[in-house]
């Protein structure tokens, strides 16, 4: 029984690696609502804004992305929903 728990713990530790920050990798410092291709990385197939846990962004970057997505939706650059 102990080996089983240890194996499970080892497997969890191996899978929990920090995600790469896509904005930092692309060299983007300020998120712009007009940059639709970048914003689409942070939207799910149901057009919901993805969480930090999924995207690997910092809290400040996540707020900037959320604001940019909302502005792009208001400007009709991104859809609110999918059909």
UniProtKB/Swiss-Prot annotation:
User: Region annotation Disordered: residue ranges?
Assistant: 1-23
Q: Which InterPro entries match?
A: Ribosomal_bS18 (IPR001648), Ribosomal_bS18_CS (IPR018275), Ribosomal_bS18_sf (IPR036870)
Entry GO CC: cytosolic small ribosomal subunit
GO aspect biological process, one term: translation
Q: Which UniProt keywords apply?
A: Ribonucleoprotein, Ribosomal protein, RNA-binding, rRNA-binding
Cell cycle in keyword set: no
List, alphabetically, the SUPFAM superfamilies matched. Answer: Ribosomal protein S18
Q: What GO molecular function terms would the record report?
A: small ribosomal subunit rRNA binding; structural constituent of ribosome
Q: State if Disulfide bond is listed as a keyword.
A: no
Q: Where is the signal peptide?
A: none
**Pfam families per the UniProt record, alphabetical:** Ribosomal_S18
Give a short account of what the protein does: Binds as a heterodimer with protein bS6 to the central domain of the 16S rRNA, where it helps stabilize the platform of the 30S subunit.
Record's subunit section: Part of the 30S ribosomal subunit. Forms a tight heterodimer with protein bS6.
The record's similarity note reads:
Belongs to the bacterial ribosomal protein bS18 family.
Q: What is this protein called?
A: Small ribosomal subunit protein bS18
Organism of derivation: Corynebacterium glutamicum (strain ATCC 13032 / DSM 20300 / JCM 1318 / BCRC 11384 / CCUG 27702 / LMG 3730 / NBRC 12168 / NCIMB 10025 / NRRL B-2784 / 534)
Q: Lineage from the top down?
A: Bacteria, Bacillati, Actinomycetota, Actinomycetes, Mycobacteriales
């Amino acid at each position: 029984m102990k080996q089983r728990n240890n194996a499970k713990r080892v497997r969890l530790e191996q899978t929990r690696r920090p995600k790469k920050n896509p904005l930092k990798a692309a060299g983007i410092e300020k998120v712009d609502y007009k940059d639709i291709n970048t914003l689409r990385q942070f939207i799910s197939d149901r057009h919901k804004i993805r969480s930090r846990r999924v995207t690997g962004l910092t809290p400040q970057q996540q707020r900037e992305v959320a604001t940019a997505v909302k502005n792009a939706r208001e400007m009709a650059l991104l859809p609110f929903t999918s059909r």
